[in-house]
């Protein structure tokens, strides 16, 4: 019996749970929320689509009842307030740090062997907070950001090329933020052909720029954070772990010398499997890419310092 818990039944959490159920990633999906009735109602709504969509995953909703999350294999943490228009990810720290820390501690009381997938923002910092405050091995704490950013990168590449997004390969590393992510245009391909041979340098730079502000663009349009792609990205990471797929996915993970950086969680390609992070993949970066990664890491370090300022670490 495989079991996944999603903490936070808001837009992102509910989307993640729905994708997990529809794709039958686990036998049971539990949604937990602090607001009375929300997760129960959404779980019931999802279960009433089972005969329409043809899945048999059991979806359970509960209000702050962590006992119902017991023995989860993977737990997705989406808790926290969403980013409002004009709000920086850094401004979220004061509120979300306390929420994420409390959630993670409660989860581990009932699922001490769970692998944690963090979606809460600022994601790199919340992943780092979880790792530092819980004392778990680093393979069991994973930030989702790179999976989402890479999907957005592939979307914008496919739009520029006029092709199916599933035929494009592209990767984003670095921090999960508008100014810290690094879309690796040099390595992007369409059916094995370097995209740089198909798009002008100017057009490729437009794609990179659109990717970097992808989240902010949606926030302006929606008036709140996006949820379909973030929820699906979380489910994608969970499926890679639960089904031991060995996929290479960019995720925010704890570095200890890899890419010349230490004591932070930041987006790099990893192999995901039943143990969570099976391996960190070190790419051969150009001098320019190395410089961008170092700047991104410095920005993430600076954001992490706020954890001490608010007393979270």
Swiss-Prot record:
One GO BP annotation of this record? tricarboxylic acid cycle
Report any Pfam family annotated for this entry: Ldh_1_C
Give any GO molecular function from the UniProt entry: L-malate dehydrogenase (NAD+) activity
Keyword NAD carried by entry:
yes
What EC number(s) is this enzyme filed under? Answer: 1.1.1.37
Give the record's keywords alphabetically: NAD, Oxidoreductase, Tricarboxylic acid cycle
> Mind telling me which CDD domains this protein's record contains?
LDH-like_MDH (cd01339)
- Which amino acid positions bind NAD(+), per UniProt? 8-13, 33, 96, 119-121
Q: Which domain of life is it from?
A: Bacteria
Is Cell membrane one of the keywords? no
Enumerate the catalysed reactions: (S)-malate + NAD(+) = oxaloacetate + NADH + H(+)
User: What residues does substrate bind to?
Assistant: 83, 89, 121, 152
Cited InterPro entries: L-lactate/malate_DH, Lactate/malate_DH_C, Lactate/malate_DH_N, Lactate_DH/Glyco_Ohase_4_C, Malate_DH_type3, NAD(P)-bd_dom_sf
Any idea which residues are catalytic in this one?
Answer: 176 (proton acceptor)
What does this protein do, in the record's words? Catalyzes the reversible oxidation of malate to oxaloacetate.
**Protein family (similarity comment):** Belongs to the LDH/MDH superfamily. MDH type 3 family.
Name this protein carries in UniProt: Malate dehydrogenase
> Quick one: which gene encodes this?
mdh
